[in-house]
UniProtKB/Swiss-Prot annotation:
Name recorded for this polypeptide: Phosphomethylpyrimidine synthase
Biological processes per GO annotation: thiamine biosynthetic process; thiamine diphosphate biosynthetic process
Coiled-coil region: none
Reaction catalysed by this enzyme: 5-amino-1-(5-phospho-beta-D-ribosyl)imidazole + S-adenosyl-L-methionine = 4-amino-2-methyl-5-(phosphooxymethyl)pyrimidine + CO + 5'-deoxyadenosine + formate + L-methionine + 3 H(+)
Amino acid sequence: MNAPDKFASLLALTREPFPASTKSYLAGSQPGLRVPVRDIQLTNGEVVSVYDTSGPYTDPAVQIDVRKGLASVRGEWIAARGDTEGYEGRVRKALDDGQKAEDGDRLAQLRAEAAALQRQPLRARSGANVTQMHYAKKGIVTPEMEYVALRENGRREWMQQYMQDAAREQRLAGNPLGASIPKIITPEFVRDEVARGRAIIPANINHPEVEPMAIGRNFKVKINANIGNSAVTSSIEEEVEKLVWAIRWGADNVMDLSTGKNIHTTRDWIVRNSPVPIGTVPIYQALEKVGGIAEDLTWEIFRDTLIEQAEQGVDYFTIHAGVRLAYIQLTAARRTGIVSRGGSIMAKWCMAHHKESFLYTHFEDICDIMKAYDVAFSLGDGLRPGCASDANDEAQFAELHTLGELTQIAWKHDVQTMIEGPGHVPMHMIQANMTEQLKTCHEAPFYTLGPLTIDIAPGYDHIASAIGAAMIGWMGTAMLCYVTPKEHLGLPDRDDVKQGIIAYKIAAHAADVAKGHPGARARDDALSQARFDFRWQDQFNLGLDPDTAKEYHDETLPKDSAKVAHFCSMCGPKFCSMKITQEVREFAQQGLQSKAEEFNRTGGELYVPIHRAD
């Protein structure tokens, strides 16, 4: 079977809608601006609408051919601005895919399979700047900003019944810890946040298929999933399947961290079929081009790689420009040294040449490339701690201060920027990370890997890190990079990806509730009510993972009759606290009814003679 057929068969597995769910769209102010939401139909007639990241893959009305890629969402908006131009683009090389011979059979096969995915690249016209930050600073509200506003608000009508009790809402009000979250997100609010640098909308002009989203402290906490092949395992079709699988379960962004063969072609398939922003670490591919020898890296090779990936449509680059020569010695006393792949590559280059990294010395040149395509910076934390005992040390914070300086340079060029953070941090040290980042990086969005709160959980690091992720998300982190059960152990498979995403959706949602994001708790209330009403199917379907919830329930009570029973296998029919509570309420109601009847029987008077009452 050829590769495209493999893609088609794999994607068929993950195109079905969620149980009891349909895709609907919120209409914007102009034709073509349609924001997806997922509507969950409840058995009591209610409809609960939730934020949706799955793109057209869960919409049966949309025809998808992965050989050709998704339909354009933003193409007309980009063209209407009149500040871009199409051009021939750089010449594709065998080395881009890790191949040595330009006329090899494998290379010809790869290119043939991806032929329909090729697009003419766009770039900014001479003298133009096409970043969302540039438009925002000029006071322009773009369609992307309106899209974000509609997406953040969602369809809120259904929430009102759960938010009518003013006393309860006051008691449960969140603590935003300094965030400024309005009750309604307006397009103007989005514009202002992007202009200030407090939010980014990752949306390369060469990725028109992307459904715009925002990463920022004053928006919903987002999560990122990592995929990518390696030198020892995985294939192109597996990575596309992981992409579709990841966004199905809630990944807001996906990073392609491929380090093996066929990097360029893998990225073609991923970007063209992705409705979410795609990020990369360009130094990985640059290293492949020099045979894996860090010392042989040059600015020219790296620059060529940036342009290659920008032309393909990558939305944000992780660039470890904060790893400076003077900081490397600060890691010498660490228990685990430098654990970032990109950080260790650049540290080795700096030591071999005994000079500052070309990522640092050419930073403004990099900005010129970024603003020509609207690629956002994800300034990498190459010196992040790799274990709890290395957290918050001098090396980590020295790099963070440099990232703050680089942020201001990027903003001078109107390049959207977010800051990457740790890593491994004990719970009691997390707040210091957030405080330091807000202060030194001028409120640019923070994007953290966890952090893992302990180091003794191999196989369960998704749990150890989700604890830290929930905390730092509440404190102000804008996006959480997921951790899977395979962290530190191996490359995650399909099931690992799902487990990592669900763990991080829990963390992100917990942070939104704690911050008091408008309406964040309504879905919890809807599920709680379904639980109290013994609407089992609604409980399953309102959860983050309906399939697993139903599977666990059916392990002991598989019959359809159990889906309407007023008990589960944990307590049984006689010890269910919620059933008992309902009976108590019924008894209380009967008692009140009895007293009312007695009141009416005695003439409806407040004070009655004793003989009449008798």
